[in-house]
């Protein structure tokens, strides 16, 4: 399983800001390491092998962690999709992704529900 680094998470954010605008930066760069650490700890301790569950964990942790000054939801979605692509899953844009990301960020949609939606959209990685 190929994970995302804190530096890549920050680069995803910076690319979003460059492309779509918004307030750059973050209050504490160490928080990117904390988000990535949270994902990797969950994967290790819960022995998660399902790519969609891990991808959903990236999305929820980043969106709810609110580590950037702006573009947290965009960065969260991009991190989830990057993780899937990096691990051999073909991804594409879907109108469902915006509502999914907002629901995950607000806590209305759980990690497992995010994973179910990603699995339905992008199919089995096995």
From Swiss-Prot:
Domain Fido: 4-120
InterPro entries tied to this protein: Doc (IPR006440), Fido (IPR003812), Type_II_TA_Toxin (IPR053737)
Listed GO MF terms: ATP binding; DNA binding; protein serine kinase activity; protein serine/threonine kinase activity
EC category: transferase
UniProt keyword list: ATP-binding, DNA-binding, Kinase, Nucleotide-binding, Repressor, Toxin-antitoxin system, Transcription, Transcription regulation, Transferase, Translation regulation
An annotated GO BP: symbiont-mediated suppression of host translation
Catalysed conversion reaction: L-seryl-[protein] + ATP = O-phospho-L-seryl-[protein] + ADP + H(+); L-threonyl-[protein] + ATP = O-phospho-L-threonyl-[protein] + ADP + H(+)
Effect of residue 82 to P: Loss of toxin and transcriptional regulatory activity
Pfam families xrefs: Fic (PF02661)
Catalytic activity, EC: 2.7.11.1
Domain of life: Viruses
Note: The concentration of antitoxin phd in P1 lysogens is far greater than that of the toxin it antagonizes. Such an excess may assure the well-being of carriers of the addicting plasmid.
Subunit architecture: Interacts with cognate antitoxin phd, the exact ratio of doc:phd varies from 1:1 to 1:3. Interaction with phd prevents kinase or phosphorylase activity on EF-Tu. Interacts with the 30S ribosomal subunit.
Role: Toxic component of a type II toxin-antitoxin (TA) system. Phosphorylates EF-Tu on 'Thr-383' in vitro; can use ATP or GTP. Also dephosphorylates in the presence of ADP or GDP. Can only phosphorylate before the ternary aminoacyl-tRNA EF-Tu-GTP complex is formed; interaction with cognate antitoxin phd prevents phosphorylation and dephosphorylation of EF-Tu. Overexpression results in inhibition of growth in liquid cultures and a decrease in colony formation by inhibiting translation, stabilizing mRNA and polysomes; these effects are overcome by concomitant expression of antitoxin phd.
Protein name: Protein kinase doc
